[in-house]
C-alpha cells in the first residue's frame, strides 16, 4: 500500500510526497512534530502539518540566510538566531572563525531533541563552543537586548501560532534596537506566487521598510516550500546587500558551498518583475 504525505499550500494546491515510514510523531508544548522518511527528499521534519525542511533541500535555506549577510558585513562577531533549533543555520555560521558568539533562541526543547536524534548532520551545529541555546520566546528575548548583535537571523517557521509575534512590527523594531549601529537582520519573507500568500508577503516588507533604512529582498529555489520559490528579507542599518557586497573578500575564504556563490549573491537580488512591483507598491505607501 502506498503511503503519501500531503501538505496543503492553497485550497487548490497540495504538495504530496511518497512516504516510506514515519520515524517520529509527538506533540510538544508548542507544536505537533513529526519526522517521515521519503524516497525523493530523504527525511522530512514536519511541524503542525507543514514541511519545515528535508534532507534534500535544507542546505539551500541555511546557506542563503548565512552567507548573504556574512558576505556584506565587514566584521561580524555576535550572531543571534531566533528559532534555529535544528542547528542547520548555526552549522553554516561555524564556517566563519571570526564569529565569536552564536546565540540561539528556540523555545521548543522537544524540537531540539528530535533534530539531534533524526537530523544529526544539521544538529551538530548546536555543539560548537560558540553556541548558547536559550529555551524561551524569541520576542521576549529581544525585548531585553540593546545594541548587542552584528547579525540577527529570524529562523522562525511562519507568521502563525507561537511564532506569530516574530512577524509583527514590534519584532522588527526590537530587532533594530538589538542590533549594533551597523547591524543586519535576515528573515523569512515567504513567497508571493499564490494569491493567498501575497498579503503576508506585502505586510512583511512594509514593516521592515518602516523599521530599517535599508530593506531588500532576495530569492532562492527550495522545492518543498509553497510554489518552490522562496524569498528572504535583508534589513540593515547601514550596509547595502549589493553596494557593500565584498565579493573578492568572500571568495578568498574558499568556503565549500552547495548553493550559494559570489555570482549567485548578485543574482539573488535580481527579482522577477511581478515581485518588484509588489515591493515597490508597499514602499510607496
Curated annotation (Swiss-Prot):
This is Polyamine aminopropyltransferase. Homodimer or homotetramer. Signal peptide: none annotated. Its EC number is 2.5.1.16. S-methyl-5'-thioadenosine binds at residues 31, 106, 137-138. Residues 2-237 form the PABS domain. It comes from Streptococcus uberis (strain ATCC BAA-854 / 0140J). One of its GO terms (molecular function) is spermidine synthase activity. Catalyzes the irreversible transfer of a propylamine group from the amino donor S-adenosylmethioninamine (decarboxy-AdoMet) to putrescine (1,4-diaminobutane) to yield spermidine.
Amino acid at each position: 500500500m502506498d503511503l503519501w504525505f500531503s501538505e496543503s499550500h492553497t485550497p487548490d494546491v497540495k504538495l504530496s510526497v511518497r512516504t516510506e515510514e514515519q520515524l517520529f510523531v509527538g506533540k510538544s508544548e508548542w507544536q505537533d512534530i513529526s519526522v517521515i522518511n521519503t524516497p525523493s527528499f530523504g527525511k522530512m521534519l514536519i511541524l503542525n502539518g507543514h514541511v519545515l525542511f528535508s534532507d534534500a533541500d535544507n542546505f539551500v535555506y541555511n546557506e542563503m540566510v548565512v552567507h548573504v549577510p556574512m558576505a556584506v558585513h565587514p566584521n561580524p562577531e555576535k550572531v543571534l538566531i531566533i528559532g534555529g533549533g535544528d542547528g542547520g543555520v548555526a552549522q553554516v555560521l561555524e564556517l566563519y572563525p571570526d564569529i565569536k558568539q552564536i546565540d540561539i533562541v528556540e523555545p521548543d526543547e522537544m524540537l531540539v531533541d528530535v533534530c539531534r536524534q533524526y537530523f544529526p548532520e544539521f544538529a551538530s551545529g548546536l555543539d560548537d563552543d560558540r553556541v548558547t541555546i536559550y529555551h524561551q520566546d524569541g520576542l521576549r528575548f529581544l525585548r531585553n537586548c540593546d545594541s548587542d548583535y552584528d547579525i540577527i537571523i529570524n529562523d522562525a517557521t511562519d507568521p502563525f501560532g507561537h511564532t506569530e509575534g516574530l512577524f509583527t512590527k514590534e519584532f522588527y523594531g526590537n530587532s533594530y534596537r538589538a542590533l549594533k549601529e551597523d547591524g543586519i537582520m535576515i528573515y523569512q519573507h515567504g513567497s508571493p506566487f499564490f494569491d493567498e500568500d501575497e498579503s503576508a508577503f506585502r505586510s512583511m516588507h512594509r514593516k521592515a521598510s518602516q523599521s530599517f533604512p535599508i530593506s531588500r529582498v532576495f530569492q532562492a529555489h527550495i522545492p518543498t516550500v509553497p510554489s518552490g520559490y522562496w524569498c528572504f528579507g535583508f534589513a540593515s542599518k547601514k550596509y547595502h546587500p549589493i553596494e557593500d557586497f565584498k565579493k573578492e573578500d568572500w571568495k578568498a575564504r574558499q568556503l565549500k558551498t552547495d548553493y550559494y556563490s559570489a555570482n549567485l549573491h548578485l543574482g539573488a537580488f535580481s527579482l522577477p518583475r511581478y515581485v518588484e512591483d509588489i515591493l515597490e507598491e508597499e514602499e510607496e505607501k
